[in-house]
Amino acid sequence: MIKDRLLQLVHLLISLALIMGALGIGNTIQNLTGVSVPGSVIGMLVLFFSMTLGLVKVEWVKPGATLFIRYMILLFVPISVGLMQHFDMLLANALPIIASAVGGSLIVLISLAWFLDYLLKEKH
């Protein structure tokens, strides 16, 4: 029983180390290149491609990823508090925020419709 729990803990620590290692690599790449993409996004791409290439197995990352997903709601609490602290600024910029959200959604929807129309015409 204790041996199984200890083994689970080791797997979790390895998983978290892999995820944090990918994050560190992503942050390093972002700092060295100065690209405007966040280091966390680059890190997740590094992790994705290392899993795609078979360098990292899904089973190795799954315990840590499951833990993050299980407690994801707690990670949004600081963001929500920050929004409430700057609610007046959010209200002052409500129109541009809504316009960009609606406009961006329409652009994606129309682009997807054109692309699907093109693909369906190619098949027939």
Curated annotation (Swiss-Prot):
Transmembrane segments: 6-26, 35-55, 72-92, 95-115
Cell location: Cell inner membrane
Species assigned in the record: Vibrio campbellii (strain ATCC BAA-1116)
Gene Ontology CC annotation, any one: plasma membrane
Family membership: Belongs to the UPF0299 family.
Topology in membrane: Multi-pass membrane protein
UniProt-listed Pfam families: LrgA
Keyword Calcium attributed: no
Keyword terms, alphabetized: Cell inner membrane, Cell membrane, Membrane, Transmembrane, Transmembrane helix
InterPro entries membership: LrgA/CidA (IPR005538), Uncharacterised_UPF0299 (IPR022957)
Protein name as annotated: UPF0299 membrane protein VIBHAR_02118
